[in-house]
A protein has these predicted regions:
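Conserved phosphate/pyrophosphate-binding and hydrolysis machinery centered on Walker-type P-loop NTPases
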Residues: 104, 343, 362
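A short structural micro-motif
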Residues: 82, 120, 345-352, 374-378
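C-terminal intrinsically disordered, low-complexity extensions immediately downstream
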Residues: 359, 363-393
Length: 393
């Protein structure tokens, strides 16, 4: 029997990924099987979705929701807020008032676009760079700052209470997402789990195990990979031999789609379709949002050591906020006065959140033991007592 032929669709015409490698040369083994007349038993496609060009022009007819000016401006406002929040968080870290921080610069469209397609009763399982999704879903800015300031109370945000906290070990939230979705299915609840992670997480076994389980049981879960081209300092070409990350869903038995992750309209549309399908009992979905990390991996990283300034400068031309602003201005949905008012509003909101964060009474060091076990083992209990200054141990 012949090997399945995988067809992938990107911005260019559909290419035969089963017969060619990245250089475009033909795979000798596949050609040999084809020449021998071995039958093709399956074909698969991964399609690429994009609506807005970097200059704000339209590549193809927009989805229905794009006629709602209030929604588009809400998406824009959320991305601007996230960027201003990021800048302030970095400033806090540089002045010793915040711990290591992961910026979202260049990736704002992914977390905001995905979250905007979710219902309130759905459950988000975010990665550490998905502040935009948390903010859209109602998490307070000061709660996010508490987390990055090393305070576990930041992981117990006031709402949505069933959303999961940030997951720092990459990919480890994927099995949790499958479990949440399994619970939804067993309870016959029309809810969806949305699991977000980066391209580096697709190299972890947790992700494949979760996807396989979800595929077998047709679970209402959407896996979203933010492909920002870099897993810290490791480029995508050293992470996978695949033409796309979306095609990894095929092995698990469900649909994967690639989307322009710098086009918030495309991200929202892909997320909406995937979530609706999962909610309607069509099984899991996988969305690969192709974007670019314009900033360092975190505030403890120096990306200039492993990528060129020219590469970053080129990618700045594709960034999501200017792209949507160009469209809104061109459609007379946004003005200079509104832009100035939004900037002032976002700065005021962020500064107020920072004041509340800095005014929060700091937790004592021994409280680090309070979020590990239901019953603390004696060895850890002794350490806790020592930190608390409760006498000899």
């Amino acid at each position: 029997m012949g090997a399945p032929i995988l067809y992938c669709a990107g911005p260019a015409p559909i290419m035969n990924c089963g017969m060619q490698n990245r250089s475009g040369s033909e795979d000798v083994a596949s050609k040999k099987m084809a020449d021998a007349g071995l039958p093709v038993i399956a074909r698969f496609e991964v399609r690429h979705r994009n609506y807005l060009a970097p200059d704000g022009s339209i590549n193809r007819p927009l989805p229905a929701f794009a006629s709602d000016a209030s929604l588009l401006t809400a998406l824009y406002r959320a991305m601007v807020l996230l960027r201003i929040f990021d800048r302030k968080a970095v400033a806090l870290q540089r002045t010793g008032r915040l711990g290591t921080y992961a910026v979202s610069l260049g990736q704002e469209a992914v977390s905001v676009g995905i979250a905007s397609a979710m219902r309130g009763e759905d459950v988000l399982l975010p990665s550490y760079r998905d502040n935009g999704a948390l903010i859209w879903r109602g998490v307070k800015l000061e709660e996010i700052l508490l987390f990055w300031g090393g305070d576990e109370r930041g992981n117990h945000f006031s709402g949505p209470v069933e959303d999961f906290p940030f997951c720092v070990p990459v990919g480890s939230q994927a099995p949790h997402a499958a479990g949440v979705a399994y619970a939804f299915k067993l309870r016959r609840e029309p809810r969806v789990a949305v699991c977000m992670f980066g391209d580096g997480a697709t190299s972890k076994g947790d992700v494949y195990e979760a996807m396989n389980f979800a595929g077998v049981h047709r679970l209402p879960v959407v896996f979203v990979v933010t492909n920002n081209q870099w897993a810290i300092s490791v480029p995508l070409r050293l992470q996978t031999g695949c033409e796309t990350l979306a095609q990894k869903a095929i092995a698990a038995g469900f649909i994967g789609e690639q989307v322009d992750g710098s086009d918030v309209v495309a991200v929202r549309a892909a997320a909406e379709d995937a979530i609706v399908a999962a909610r309607d009992g069509q099984g899991p979905r996988f969305v690969e949002a192709v974007t670019y990390r314009l900033g360092d991996h975190t505030t403890s990283d120096d990306a200039s050591r492993y990528r060129s300034a020219d590469e970053v400068q080129t990618r700045w031309k594709e960034e999501p906020i200017a792209r949507l602003r160009n469209y809104l201005v061109g459609q007379k949905m946004w003005s200079k006065a509104e832009e100035e008012a939004l900037a002032a509003e976002c700065h005021a909101r962020v500064e107020a959140a920072v004041e509340r964060y800095l005014a929060t009474e700091q937790r004592r060091p021994e409280t680090m033991f309070d979020h590990l076990y239901a019953r603390l083992p004696e060895a850890y209990a002794a350490q806790r007592r020592e930190l608390a200054g409760e006498g000899d141990v």
